[in-house]
From Swiss-Prot:
PANTHER family in alphabetical order: UNDECAPRENYL-DIPHOSPHATASE
UniProt KW keywords: Antibiotic resistance, Cell inner membrane, Cell membrane, Cell shape, Cell wall biogenesis/degradation, Hydrolase, Membrane, Peptidoglycan synthesis, Transmembrane, Transmembrane helix
Official protein name in the record: Undecaprenyl-diphosphatase
Membrane topology of this protein: Multi-pass membrane protein
Family to which this protein belongs: Belongs to the UppP family.
Species for this entry: Parvibaculum lavamentivorans (strain DS-1 / DSM 13023 / NCIMB 13966)
MF annotations from Gene Ontology: undecaprenyl-diphosphatase activity
GO biological process: cell wall organization; peptidoglycan biosynthetic process; regulation of cell shape; response to antibiotic
Ranges annotated as spanning the membrane: 42-62, 86-106, 108-128, 158-178, 184-204, 218-238, 246-266
Record function comment: Catalyzes the dephosphorylation of undecaprenyl diphosphate (UPP). Confers resistance to bacitracin.
HAMAP family referenced in this protein's UniProt entry, alphabetically: Undec_diphosphatase (MF_01006)
Location of the protein in the cell: Cell inner membrane
Length: 268
């Protein structure tokens, strides 16, 4: 196939799958890569929503056994109920603020310079928190108290600022309240399922009519690319952070945000 947009759709799908669950901001990466590629065949918001669904499907597949077990055992197992309760409680703060300030976020905060500043600031925060060498006390989501979940949920509110990174804010909050690195990463994955599914349903409800039959092969290519790349990245991330931590992602954010800032300054 000689259609350059088909290749661009695959590239953007890979970018989404790689960056969605790393604490590096998928928004910032999709903005810059989409602009560099000049990808405009599919309405941007529609395409972004669909490839996010591909990334979420990867989490559901990878953790299908654990998620099924939690749902099955919830009536009789306290740990399973803790798991479900922690997800629900952590969703509340950002969910409320997101509804209240949705228009403000889109109209005021969704600018290249805000994204750059959020990338750099978030990177500095990750490096600083890792250098604190905090002693982890919580080693599984099933052991979360509702207070722990609420504190992490409050941190997730920061991710309403474009460029902060939903997974980055969740992981930072988890580390600060004593969650071990692997569990912090996994909680960010589990929390992403209802967050991104809900956001996708709302977005598709408002934009599905923009999809044409000519776009379907591009949407499918991006979806599959996001699914496969997310599968690989999530498996690697859990192993990597257990022994290396998140510092490298902090430095990457600082570098990427600085380069983006230079790029947008020169292009304007």
């Amino acid at each position: 196939m000689n259609d350059p947009n088909f290749l661009h759709a695959i590239i953007l799908g890979i970018v989404e799958g790689v960056s969605e669950f790393l604490p590096i901001s998928s928004t910032g990466h999709l903005i810059i890569v989409g602009e560099l590629l000049g990808f405009s065949s599919v309405p941007g918001k529609v395409f972004e929503v669909v490839i996010q669904l591909g990334a979420i499907l990867a989490i559901c597949v990878l953790y299908s056994g654990r998620l099924t077990r939690v749902l099955r055992d919830a009536p009789r197992d306290a740990g399973a109920r803790n798991f479900i309760g922690a997800i629900f409680v952590a969703l509340i703060p950002a969910g409320l603020l997101g509804v209240l300030y949705h228009d403000f976020i889109l109209e005021v905060l969704f600018t290249p310079y805000v994204v750059c500043a959020a990338l750099i600031t978030g990177g500095i925060a990750i490096v600083v928190v890792e250098r604190l060498h905090l002693e982890p006390r919580i080693t599984s989501v099933e052991a979360f108290s509702m207070r722990t979940a609420l504190k992490i949920g409050l941190f997730q509110c920061i991710a309403l600022v474009p460029g902060v990174s939903r997974s980055g804010a969740t992981i930072l909050g988890a580390l600060l309240v004593g969650v071990e690195r692997k569990t912090a990463a996994e909680f960010s994955f589990f929390l992403a399922i209802p967050v991104m599914l809900g956001a996708s349903v709302v977005s598709l409800r408002d934009t599905w009519q923009l999809i044409s039959m000519d776009d379907l092969h591009l949407i499918a290519a991006g979806f599959i690319a996001a699914f496969i790349s997310a599968l690989l990245v999530v498996k690697w991330l859990v192993s990597f952070v257990s022994s290396h931590g998140f510092t490298v992602f902090g430095w990457y954010r600082i570098l990427f945000g600085s380069l983006l800032l230079i790029y947008f300054s020169l292009s304007s």
